[in-house]
Amino acid sequence: MPGALYLVDSNVLLRWIKPDDRDYPLVVSAIEIALQNDAVLCYTSQNVGEFWNTCTRPLERNGYGLSPQEADRRAAIFERKLRLLPDSLAVHQEWRRLLVSHNVSGVQVHDARLVAAMRVHAVKRVLTFNEKDFARYPGIEAVHPRSLAAETR
C-alpha cells in the first residue's frame, strides 16, 4: 500500500537536478526519506513549465542558462521517478473556483493551479521551500524539505 502523496514543487525540482545548489543535499535527503517511507511523489505539467522556464532562462536573468535540449534531459530525470497528475477539465474548474474564492492575483495564480491539481487528485501535501505560498488553502499541508528530512533522524 503506497504512503502519503506529495506534490513536489518546482523550487524543489530545480534544486534536485542541480548538484552545485546549496540545498541539493537537503533535497536529495528529503526525497530519499519520502521514498523510503513509501511516499508517492508527484508533479504536474505546470511544474514542468516552471522548471523549463528557469532552466532555459539566461543566467543574467536569474535562470540556469541551459539549452532546451539540456532542460529536456534534466526534466526527464524527475519525470521517470515521479507520478504525473494530469490536467483535466476538473483541474481547470477547481483552479477557476480557487482564483475567485481565495482572491488570487498576480503570480499567485501558479500556486493556485498546483493546489487545484492536488485537490482533484487527492494530494494533501506539497514539498516546497515556500510554505507560505500554500498557507491560504485549507486541507493543503506545505512541507519544507528540512522538516521531512528531520522526521526520521
Q: Language model features by range: what are they?
A:
Residues 83-129:
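Active-site neighborhoods of divalent-metal-dependent phosphate/nucleic-acid chemistry enzymes
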Residues 42-45, 128:
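Short beta-strand segments at enzyme active-site cores
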Residues 1-43, 58-69, 149-153:
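Short, well-structured N-terminal submotif of metal-dependent ribonuclease cores
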Residues 74-92, 96, 103, 134-153:
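Short acidic, glycine/proline-enriched helix-loop-strand junctions
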Residues 1-5, 112-153:
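Acidic, PIN/NYN-like endoribonuclease modules and their adjacent C-terminal/linker elements
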Residues 54-86:
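Helix-adjacent hinge/juxtasegments
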Residues 11-12, 46, 113, 132:
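Alpha-helix/helix-capping structural signal
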